[in-house]
Amino acid sequence: MSGISDPVSNYMAQLRNAQEAEQTYVDIPASKLKRAMTQILLEKGYIKNFVNIDDEKQGLLRVYLKYDEYDQPAIRMLERVSRPGRREYADSDNLPEVKNGLGIVILSTSRGVMSDKEARRFGVGGEVLAKVF
């Protein structure tokens, strides 16, 4: 173990594991970044909903997972791109696409956390946090 913690990778692993276990929801330690990423997942239809829960500490995000009529998770792929040891950035002209635009890329930009489509609209680049399909 390297000793470097990566809260975003932990967040994504918790979502994946909860989906594999076909859970209705998962409670994840909250942060501004995770809240922003979860809001994007909600807006793009990858989760049902989420709520903030006060636990007298940092708080929790209760993320309600979404499944189709065949009990398949709405999130088919959730992949971390930029990591603490290897940051990856893209400018507005070179933003990656997921599955020819069917998926999304989540970026941390100077204007906040947003999807690749929003970043293109605003003409900004940033750190490529994750790919979702």
Swiss-Prot record:
GO term, biological process aspect, one: translation
MF terms in GO: rRNA binding; structural constituent of ribosome
UniProt keyword terms in alphabetical order: Ribonucleoprotein, Ribosomal protein, RNA-binding, rRNA-binding
Short name of any one Pfam family annotated for the protein: Ribosomal_S8
Top-level taxon of origin: Bacteria
InterPro entries, per database record: Ribosomal_uS8, Ribosomal_uS8_CS, Ribosomal_uS8_sf
Self-association and partners: Part of the 30S ribosomal subunit. Contacts proteins S5 and S12.
Protein's UniProt name: Small ribosomal subunit protein uS8
Organism: Salinibacter ruber (strain DSM 13855 / M31)
